[in-house]
Design a protein with these regions (language model features):
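N-terminal membrane-targeting hydrophobic helices
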Residues: 1-154
């Protein structure tokens, strides 16, 4: 799954839990749950992977900034923790590019690789998931403002 979607799901988790440690841990768990769900992937070589990964990583960082900015002050730390936890397991990819190895033990990398349910024709799932997570996060963080009768009928 795209890291942007992991970030947005982490924002939902942080907004829902409102506590830093549970948000971080739930974010990590959510990463593996989402990676086990059907999603877009199966890149044919590193150049194609990088064409997707670089813009996705930058968009993920932008979403982290946006969701942190949208979050009310009292929820910001939990939202940031949820997003960080949700994105953390994918640090293996840039670590391999820049340092030649994953920061995680082999058993974690093997599990992460084994659970992937990717196919090249599932981009629509990524878009749908991203929209759903973004709307849920903004809804939880900003709330649905109710109109009073006085606002509708002067």
């Amino acid at each position: 799954m795209l890291v942007t979607n992991h970030v947005l799901s982490g924002a939902v988790i942080g907004a829902s839990t409102r506590r830093v440690a549970p948000a971080f841990l739930a974010g990590i768990v959510s990463h593996f749950v989402l990676d086990a769900a059907p999603h877009w992937g199966k890149w044919r070589g590193r150049p194609k992977f990088m064409q997707v990964a670089v813009p996705d990583g930058l968009l993920g960082l932008a979403m982290m900034a946006a969701m942190t900015a949208v979050a009310p002050r009292g929820r910001r730390a939990a939202v940031l923790a949820g997003m960080t936890g949700a994105a953390l397991p994918d640090l293996d990819k840039p670590s391999r590019v820049f340092f030649g190895r994953s920061p995680f033990p082999h058993v974690v990398d093997a599990f992460h690789w084994k659970i992937q349910n990717e196919a090249p024709h599932r981009f629509k799932y990524e878009v749908a998931a991203g929209l759903a997570f973004a709307l849920a996060a903004v809804g939880l963080l900003r709330g649905v403002r109710r109109l009073s009768v006085r606002q509708v009928l002067p």
